[in-house]
């Protein structure tokens, strides 16, 4: 087995920019930006734009597209288009 080929796996804090929530977890990603966590230790911080805390699928605030109405409007608008002459 080759040594020193795997990335470093360490604790990091993910900061959700949309909701302001922070998660402490382990990852191979690193950052020069750090934060002091609730336990008093300092960890690298990774800013993410969206996470499970702010994504509409997980929060239950998703919008449902009215695709049936759109199809009906399209068919009504182009009903006679492309017919035989």
Curated annotation (Swiss-Prot):
GO terms for cellular component: ribonucleoprotein complex; ribosome. PROSITE patterns: RIBOSOMAL_L31. This is Large ribosomal subunit protein bL31B. GO terms for biological process: translation. It comes from the Bacteria. Keywords: Ribonucleoprotein, Ribosomal protein. Disulfide bonds: none annotated. The keyword Ribonucleoprotein applies. SUPFAM superfamilies: L28p-like. The keyword 4Fe-4S does not apply. Pfam families: Ribosomal_L31. InterPro entries: Ribosomal_bL28/bL31-like_sf, Ribosomal_bL31, Ribosomal_bL31_B, Ribosomal_bL31_sf. Part of the 50S ribosomal subunit. Belongs to the bacterial ribosomal protein bL31 family. Type B subfamily. GO terms for molecular function: structural constituent of ribosome.
